[in-house]
Design a protein with these regions (language model features):
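Membrane-topology segments of multi-pass transport proteins
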Residues: 1-5, 38-336
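A structural signal for multi-pass alpha-helical bundles of membrane permease subunits
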Residues: 2-97, 103-105, 109, 117-121, ...
Length: 549
């Protein structure tokens, strides 16, 4: 190989690699965004990759990464002086927090907030001038907000149950909140009653160095029969430790366990909901609950018709488990928010039917144009090609009126029946390919007694497989990604295909970027997998179609 050829190939491969990287960036961004939690999405500094979860062995704790990066001058002195201002506000620091380390982080947090709120002209002055301008802004409320950003505390609030008749009851309301659940692992966790902004809750001080889990249990009397129990809710504040909260329920002599854990991600108050299987699971409503699966009869289980036993278990996560929880969290949320598999079934049905009808109708019509002799063939072929010149927007309203008059509105019929009549473009592609097939094969088959349909089925179709594969791929992508058709013809959410279902999902979650990207990735993967495995047929089909005729 000559030096010129080496340089030529090097440049060619470099351009191909660069192009691949450039075109892969949007997909990489979608994939990384799909596994981010909300605070990463709305952070003031953009970061392509998700932040690594940090499992904690003890809690409560300080998150020293929240204000790890600061911008602005005088970073060596001002954070400590802001910490002194925080002390001067009289903010009540919890006794179980390290005061020195906490105020140090709060000083950094106040510095960051002042850097973003004060005019930049002030920051060109001395440290004393900056401190003087910032002092009126350092209030107890401001300090409290900064403290909430760096302090992580696992807390349990009230537990509520609801019956099928919508009777709501707070469990253990006659007891202090820290005594409503019995501590089964005192060597791991200590329960303390605390209050914050008028809300009473149980603070969990834990240490997983001896055991990797803690367990809290409680037996409660219900105001209704346990058979009517619909859902259980726990108001809690996670501590961003990425641990796993599991629930098991005993009632009516049976034990029920959660099918998956509630992940202790983020650090704002949230509601964890568990519910037994029921009609809601197959409905189109947003599923904000975790299913409780029936484990069958259990020895010693509560059997009183108006009594229930709850067992909450918090399990410490390793770094690998925490990463798995983070990678799957948003995807579980997507599957909970929409009837994803119902949408997938509809899309798969449409894909299979449309591909089958398109391949059959287009190949049969192309065969008649390419191999059969009949009066007006060329005129009909030109007329068919002329239909490609008509913009689809022109025929959109007439199509809608026709389908509505036929009673097919709000059914799947308009989304697949039209494919039984072929596609002008695909017919043209197949005709060009068929015209390149030697007529000797057809003549030999006729001598053997084959009619035109048998020739079509046994001779022509096997020879045009690459082109059929290309058409199948195009049809798959068009049907899988079809948005306009369902938008026009479908009103019943139960009939939504995946593309339109994800649009409705994006509206429901107010275009939350992480959830939207997770849903989009789930929709994109089948197309990518199909093209990856079928690219040889796709390239072969398009190439041969282009050179035949």
């Amino acid at each position: 190989m000559t030096p010129t050829q080496i340089v030529h190939k090097t440049v060619l491969y470099a351009l191909l690699a660069t192009g691949s990287i450039v075109f892969a960036i949007p997909f990489v961004w979608m994939a990384t965004t799909s596994v981010k939690v909300d605070r990463e999405l709305f952070a003031e500094r953009f970061q392509l990759t998700p932040v690594s979860p940090q499992p904690r062995q003890t809690g409560p704790y300080l998150d020293e990464t929240y204000y790890a990066r600061l911008e602005g001058p005088h970073q060596d002195t001002l954070p400590d002086r802001f910490a002194e201002l925080a002390r001067a506000t009289g903010f009540s620091l919890p006794s179980d927090m390290d005061a020195l380390a906490t105020y140090r982080q709060m000083g950094r947090g106040l510095y960051d907030k002042m850097w973003r709120s004060l005019p930049k002209a002030i920051w060109t002055g001395s440290a004393d001038a900056i401190l003087l301008a910032a002092s009126p802004e350092i209030t107890t409320e401001q300090v409290s907000r900064v403290f909430d950003n760096v302090a992580r505390r696992l807390s349990f609030g009230q537990i509520q149950v609801r019956s099928e008749e919508l009777i709501t009851q707070e469990l253990g309301s006659d007891l202090p909140i820290d005594r409503r659940l019995r501590n089964e692992t005192p060597e791991v966790v200590t329960l303390t009653e605390r209050s914050e902004k008028g809300l009473s809750f149980t603070s969990l001080t834990y240490d997983f160095s001896k055991r990797d889990r803690l367990r809290l249990m409680g037996t409660f009397n219900l105001a209704f029969d346990v058979a009517a129990l619909q859902r259980i809710q726990l108001y809690l504040k996670p501590d961003d430790s990425w641990g796993e909260l599991w629930l098991s329920v005993e009632k009516g002599g049976k034990r029920y366990t959660a099918e998956r854990p509630f992940i202790l991600a983020n650090f704002s108050w949230a509601t964890a909901t568990w519910q037994e299987p029921g009609p809601d699971d197959v409905s189109t409503k947003i599923k904000t609950w975790i299913l409780l699966k029936d484990d069958g009869p259990a020895a010693g289980a509560v059997n009183d018709p108006r009594q229930i036993k709850l067992s909450f278990e918090v399990r410490h996560s390793t770094l690998l488990q925490a990463w798995w929880n983070k990678l799957t969290l948003n995807y579980y949320r997507v599957l909970d928010h929409i009837p994803f598999w119902r949408y997938v079934r509809t899309s798969v049905f449409l894909v299979l039917v449309n591909i089958s009808l398109t391949l059959f109708s287009c190949s049969l019509v192309a065969y008649s144009f390419a191999r059969l002799q009949w009066p007006g063939r060329e005129f009909c072929f030109v007329l068919m090609l002329a239909t490609m010149m008509i913009p689809p927007q022109v025929t959109m309203i007439p199509h809608f009126l026709i389908w509505k008059a036929l009673g097919a509105y709000d059914t799947l019929l308009p989304l697949w029946f039209g494919h039984a009549f072929g596609s002008a473009f695909f017919i043209f592609l197949l005709r060009q390919f068929m015209k390149g097939i030697p007529r000797d094969l057809e003549d030999a088959a006729r001598i053997d007694g084959c009619g035109f349909l048998r020739i079509y089925w046994h001779i022509i179709l096997p020879l045009i497989k690459p082109s059929l594969a290309t058409i199948a791929i195009f049809t798959f992508m068009a049907t899988w990604n079809d948005f306009m058709g369902p938008l026009i013809y479908i009103a019943d959410q139960r009939l939504y295909p995946l593309a339109f279902g994800l649009y409705a999902f994006a509206v429901q979650v107010s275009n939350n970027p992480a959830l939207t990207m997770a849903a989009g990735l789930l929709m994109t993967l089948p197309v990518m997998v199909l093209f990856f495995f079928a690219q040889r047929y796709f390239i072969q089909g398009t190439t041969l179609t282009g050179i035949k005729g």
